Design a protein with these regions (language model features):
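Short, Lys/Arg-rich flexible segments
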Residues: 1-150
Length: 150
């Protein structure tokens, strides 16, 4: 009679490696997102034109919370003009071609900031700094997340 047997050695080590994979993945993704928002903030601050420095100082980030949400924002109560710098104030919004944000997504977002009092901000050209910084870093974020090893 011919017979053979098979077995797996190191199964306990393999189980241990997979047991904490979910936690390690969450940590890896959170770290990648946190580093990305810091990079986006730095890029946006470097890209924005400085007159008084108020807009540049208003560019801030918040790292991930328990829901995995992080953001970079520009503007505050005293710098309400940030979206007008980003998107301009002309009727025909002229946004740059981006890789990770479609033109329709850009336009939809930009339309939220249509100038309510055109006398105050008229015909300001588009001078993007935040969306272009996001676009630059988003692909790097995805690549970093994909690098995760179990």
């Amino acid at each position: 009679m011919a017979a053979f047997s098979m077995g797996i050695t190191g199964l306990d080590a393999l189980r241990a490696k997979f047991s904490d994979a979910s936690e390690r993945l969450e940590r890896h993704v959170a770290d990648a997102i946190n580093q990305t928002v810091v990079n986006i903030q730095q890029d946006a601050k470097a890209a924005v034109k400085v007159k008084t420095g108020a807009l540049q100082r208003s560019i801030t980030h918040k790292k991930t919370d328990k829901t995995g949400t992080a953001y970079v924002s520009a503007g505050n109560k005293s710098v309400k003009y940030a979206p007008y710098v980003e998107f301009g104030t002309r009727h025909n919004i002229n946004l740059p071609a981006l890789i990770n944000i479609t033109p329709s997504e850009q336009s939809k977002f930009a339309r939220q900031y249509i100038v309510q009092s055109p006398k105050k901000f008229t015909n300001q050209a588009t001078r993007p700094f935040l969306m272009t910084s996001f676009d630059k870093r988003y692909s790097q974020l995805l690549y970093t997340i994909k690098e995760f090893k179990i």
